């Protein structure tokens, strides 16, 4: 279990940083390229552990994939060309891989077994397996398909109109991907609109997708045609440096090529409401996935209330938003964020426990947390518990804490941001 020592940053973080490729888009580009007809070239791919798990699984199903750093070439097999895997499909730590791939496996007439690491074994799969079973897929797993390992025997599916109890892009995507080979029109309705990378990318691959309010529909029988994908930087990774730039004294950062998909930019809205000083300069207007350069500098923040429709737009950024709130004047309330409990860790409990160790005044609620600012943080030994976003949040906290902060299980950051610590060190010089 590797640990990292973080020293206080006395002279601020300064400089330009190119944010690594978006994890959600990288996963989808590989998957959609695999089931498309023709060769897909991906630039800006995130070579983190999660996305490499996706490549590994599709290679196991006979897809020819060549990865060289952040460039990937996928020779598509078409919707009907995947081969039955001879080995168990191992998704590692990747919830996106297992949930989206389940939708593809559900419509493919062969047998497969899917598993992941200890964290994946605790994450709820029934939200995906139930609708896929309703469509006609034969899926089993521990506790009637609630937990991995899962076995899937795909085949002829019928379209469904599904109302999801949760706003989850993974649930929505699994059903839509299954619907590509289902008879009829598949529709998914959500309580709030979740991230829409799947819909955008399906359209880029030539699939007609219809959006009506909180409902997304597609007709079965549509083919995907290979295309080139340019992956923008991951706003969820950018969030750590956006908050760092705002709360570390004497800082000014330029974050280049940050994905600005409106279903993902809740962090930008929150920082604006808290009073952060930043500018956003769009760089690729008209692209299916917009991006921008963002300049942010040390700011005086104030506490706010965060809840409702914005939560799906910033669910992965809540750990670092909580850190920002410890440095804001007044009280910040985060609510309606039950989904935090079923991430890589229970992020409500983990954020509260680890920030409390550093001296923050923060308490857990059933659906979020209450943070009392402004707190002077003090260095301590903390733990990521294998959760990449907790690890990065604690590293930024260590930059403003008095004395050194030791992060246990720090290598978890490699899931989404392999060069995170090197970038942090470079900007602190």
UniProtKB/Swiss-Prot annotation:
It is found in: Cytoplasm. The lineage of its organism: Bacteria, Bacillati, Bacillota, Bacilli, Bacillales. It catalyses: 3-phosphoshikimate + phosphoenolpyruvate = 5-O-(1-carboxyvinyl)-3-phosphoshikimate + phosphate. Gene3D superfamilies: Enolpyruvate transferase domain. The active site is at residue 316. One of its GO terms (biological process) is chorismate biosynthetic process. Its main location: cytoplasm. 3-phosphoshikimate binds at residues 23-24, 28, 168, 170, 316, 343. Pathway: Metabolic intermediate biosynthesis; chorismate biosynthesis; chorismate from D-erythrose 4-phosphate and phosphoenolpyruvate: step 6/7. Keywords: Amino-acid biosynthesis, Aromatic amino acid biosynthesis, Cytoplasm, Transferase. It comes from Bacillus thuringiensis subsp. konkukian (strain 97-27). InterPro entries: Enolpyruvate_Tfrase_dom (IPR001986), Enolpyruvate_Tfrase_sf (IPR036968), EPSP_synthase (IPR006264), EPSP_synthase_CS (IPR023193), RNA3'P_cycl/enolpyr_Trfase_a/b (IPR013792). This is 3-phosphoshikimate 1-carboxyvinyltransferase. Phosphoenolpyruvate binds at residues 23, 95, 123, 170, 347, 389. GO terms for molecular function: 3-phosphoshikimate 1-carboxyvinyltransferase activity. Monomer. Coiled coil: none annotated. Catalyzes the transfer of the enolpyruvyl moiety of phosphoenolpyruvate (PEP) to the 5-hydroxyl of shikimate-3-phosphate (S3P) to produce enolpyruvyl shikimate-3-phosphate and inorganic phosphate. Belongs to the EPSP synthase family. Its EC number is 2.5.1.19. One of its GO terms (cellular component) is cytoplasm.
